[in-house]
Amino acid sequence: MLPSLIQPCSWILLLLLVNSSLLWKNVASLPMCAMRNDRCFMFFEDTFELAGSLSHNISIEVSELFTEFEKHYSNVPGLRDKSPMRCHTSFLPTPENKEQARHIRYEALLKSGDMILDAWENPLDYLVSELSTIKNVPDIIISKATDIKKKINAVQNGVNALMSTMNGDEENKNPAWFLQSDNEDARIRSSYGMISCLDNDFKKVDIYLNILKCYMLKIDNC
């Protein structure tokens, strides 16, 4: 029997993932759901297969965005300052790595991913908006950031639906680096910090969802 937490809303995540049109060229030919009592039930295995694949692809794209941004603005003073920057998600009680995540119950692991995704809802909007106003920013950076935002939103909406039976929504607070400044270098460093945090956080989400995929699909050696 499937876990009660997952069954009712798993079809929402799959629809959102499919609509993101990532990786799946022939998905239209696949059965989208099984009808039962006039309701649509998604195939459980497909949900986690797609979620894991999409999250991994997003993680790669965020890392590429970070590298491109760092390379383009490498001459900005203080960009690579080694002093630690506190990300707005650092207070969240989530596993830091794959080893920790392996020892977490799947419900708690899904909740960890949900908390990170929810915490990035407003910052993602801000990041894309801010990047478009920075002087001489390459179009490819804006395009990638916009595409990443859409794909992350798809995963976020699906995971939120899965978590809807748990605690109510927590307030999303703006990160400390939500700043309004006329100093171009300061704005570039702020955006760089945001992308760095997003890169780190989505590596975690990728780990969580793929551990869940392996757990639910009984895949060895993940």
Curated annotation (Swiss-Prot):
Localisation per UniProt entry: Secreted
Disulfide bonds: 33-40, 87-197, 214-222
Molecular function as annotated in GO: hormone activity
Highest taxon in the source lineage: Eukaryota
PROSITE patterns the UniProt entry points to: SOMATOTROPIN_1, SOMATOTROPIN_2
Sorted UniProt keywords: Disulfide bond, Glycoprotein, Secreted, Signal
Cleavable signal peptide: 1-29
SUPFAM superfamilies found in the cross-reference section: 4-helical cytokines
InterPro entries per the UniProt record, alphabetical: 4_helix_cytokine-like_core, Somatotropin/Prolactin, Somatotropin_CS
Pfam families hit by this protein: Hormone_1
Record keyword Secreted present: yes
Keyword presence, Signal: yes
PTM: N-glycosylated and sialylated.
GO CC annotation terms, alphabetical: extracellular space
This protein's name: Prolactin-2C5
